[in-house]
Amino acid sequence: MEKQKYIKKAIDWAKKRGYSGIKANLEEFETPTQFSKPNDDQPYIPDVTGKKRNKKIYIEIATKTEDTRRRVTKWKLLSTLASMKGGKFFLLAPHGHKAFTQRLLDKYNLNAQLVYIR
């Protein structure tokens, strides 16, 4: 799956910036805490989480999708959690997905830092 390749890049990106306690939605890592909404049978699991100086970060790989409603709901949740914990929310957009991601950020006024990855 292509997203797994980008999750590994996100882990490297976070480590290079001094984040530790990395959890990732990959088999070889501890899975980040999942969040559920009432009446929603699918939990929201961040792609990557980490900490630096007790500040929590959430990282999502931002790729194009047909289900933008669910994607935006997840991003709003992670953005809110990051704010509550004094941390940051990063969206890492692979080549070809940056414009799509920027449009969603602008349309829904999401508080996230967009980072381009290759």
Question: Where do the model's predicted regions map?
Answer:
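Well-ordered, non-membrane alpha-helical segments in soluble/globular domains
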Residues: 4-10, 69-76
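Domain-level recognition of nuclease-like catalytic cores that cleave nucleotide substrates
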Residues: 92-118
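Active-site metal-binding core of divalent-cation-utilizing nuclease and nuclease-like domains
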Residues: 1-4, 12, 16, 20-55
